[in-house]
């Protein structure tokens, strides 16, 4: 007869034959109201669907189906392809497209910021989605750093009156104190309007010189 300790070990041993069960909780989406920047739409933010990393065990098929059932039409993904592989969802972008969700992939390094030209492109694409009343979601890995940075930039992009601090506060009220995670991201927000204006001015100058 086996000693009790070995019986317990065999009963609760999580071997390859008995994989850890995926989480059954619905994926949590936070909806940012854009009413304060004269837009009637909401922008969704969430963590990486289907993520399997450390103690997180989500089911990518289930999460994707939930997003589809929520009516999500466009998704902006800020994870790099390397991250998608690391977090065990290497085919996530294809899966979105198979579900009929339009996918906008704008990779930003974890903890980092996009260059201003890339950020301007993201702002223009987001604005187009929202103006066309498309239900839009953005996500990175945790839904706190890069996603909140982009959402805060959108608030500044859509309104001249909201301040960087107010934009940060809006995201922290929505996603918690971990939103906007690095000094680099914090500084980027405070410099965003000046850099955007310089970029747009340069782009206009180039287009004028080409058309001559």
From Swiss-Prot:
The keyword Cytoplasm applies. Its EC number is 3.1.3.16, 3.1.3.48. Changing residue 78 to L: In HCC; patient T9. Induction: Up-regulated in breast and prostate cancer cells. Residues 1-20 are annotated as: Disordered. Pfam families: CDKN3. The keyword Cytoplasm applies. It is found in: Cytoplasm, Perinuclear region. One of its GO terms (cellular component) is cytoplasm. Residues 1-12 have a biased composition (Polar residues). GO terms for molecular function: protein serine/threonine phosphatase activity; protein tyrosine phosphatase activity; protein tyrosine/serine/threonine phosphatase activity. Residues 1-34 are annotated as: Interaction with CDK2. InterPro entries: CDK_inhib_3, CDKN3, Prot-tyrosine_phosphatase-like, PTP, Tyr_Pase_cat, Tyr_Pase_dom, TYR_PHOSPHATASE_DUAL_dom. Belongs to the protein-tyrosine phosphatase family. This is Cyclin-dependent kinase inhibitor 3.
